[in-house]
UniProtKB/Swiss-Prot annotation:
It comes from Hydra vulgaris. Keywords: Repeat, Ribonucleoprotein, Ribosomal protein, WD repeat. GO terms for molecular function: ribosome binding; translation regulator activity. This is Small ribosomal subunit protein RACK1. GO terms for cellular component: ribonucleoprotein complex; ribosome. It holds the Pfam family WD40.
Length: 317
């Protein structure tokens, strides 16, 4: 039996940790985004529980909450978005912004890179989805048939044979877009509350969505249909598929739920102990999740400004 064990924490942000990005190019580096308006490049040392790594570089420039961050496939560049209405492209070696993307009229909530890193998609509280090139030029704004409320999350499919974008929003909808013509391919109905997260499986065949209603809904991207629903039991703030196991992870309130998708059963439920004796102290919520490229380590960002690091271990049963 496989389970998850808490290995350590990363302390450095002064605000909620809104997103975490990892890269196969450098397993000792992760990047995190925060409501403290910064991004931190972490050097992982894996020393012990209290010192799993240290902040190597702090990237500053956004003047409001940083809501999302992604790494380029070579691990050299990062792309972030913020409630300051902009996106930024960062050269990580130099720790500087090389390009600012201006065009959204309200907070930008989500950003993603296409598989070849040539296209960028962003979603905003202005209810639009924008496609950009790496030079910071907006090539297309999806408005026809777009979300009628905030666009909370946008993701590209990693499958280059089926070039699509998946988005979700506060209108309870999951939408699948044809990347070739930016036209709507499928509307997925079923959620009963606003959506926070959508994620595409590593092979591009499935996507999962979640939000206020606490359900993780799985959709077949090839057939364009609903497959099944998993009960998260609390508001879902983040979702991610394991890169090498048939697992889906959901950040649901203070917990992280991990499902085996073949069995549709819970592999593990991760909850950090509440520190503090006061009965009022509520456990922090988990709001971001990222797997290491090898699928052995799960990084989780919380509203107590910490990143907690969990590792896959084998139990003796």
């Amino acid at each position: 039996m496989e389970q998850m064990t808490l290995r350590g924490t990363l302390k450095g942000h002064n605000g909620w940790v809104t997103q975490i990005a990892t890269t196969p190019q450098n397993p000792d580096l992760i990047l995190s985004a925060s409501r403290d308006k910064t991004l931190i490049q972490w050097q992982l040392t894996r020393d012990d529980q209290t010192n799993y790594g240290f902040p190597k570089k702090c990237l500053t420039g956004h003047n409001h909450f940083v809501s999302d961050v992604v790494l380029s496939s070579d691990g050299q560049f990062a792309l972030s978005c913020s409630w300051d209405k902009t996106l930024r492209l960062w050269d990580l070696n130099q720790g500087i912004t090389t390009k600012q993307f201006v065009g959204h009229t309200k907070d930008v909530l989500s950003v993603a890179f296409s598989a070849d890193n040539r296209q960028i998609v962003s979603g905003s509280r202005d209810n639009t989805i924008k496609l950009w090139n790496t030079l910071g030029q907006c090539k297309y704004t999806i408005q026809d048939e777009s979300h009628s409320e905030w666009v909370s999350c946008v993701r590209f499919s990693p499958n280059t044979q089926n070039p699509i974008i998946v988005s979700c929003g506060w209108d309870k909808m999951v939408k699948v877009w044809n990347l070739t013509n930016c036209k709507l391919k499928t509307n997925h109905f079923g959620h009963t509350g606003y959506l926070n997260a959508v994620t595409v499986s590593p092979d591009g065949s499935l996507c999962a969505s979640g939000g206020k209603d606490g359900n993780a809904m799985l959709w077949d991207l090839n057939e364009g249909k609903h497959l099944y629903t998993l009960d998260g039991g609390n508001v879902i703030n983040a979702l991610c598929f394991s890169p090498n196991r048939y697992w889906l992870c959901a950040a649901t309130g203070p917990m992280i739920k991990i499902w085996d998708l073949e069995m549709k059963s819970v592999v593990d439920e991760l909850k950090p102990g509440v520190i503090g004796i006061s009965t009022k102290s509520r456990a922090a919520d988990c709001i971001s999740l990222a797997w290491s490229a090898d699928g052995q380590t799960l990084f989780a960002g919380y509203t107590d400004n910490l990143i907690r690091v969990w590792q896959v271990t084998r139990s003796s049963q």
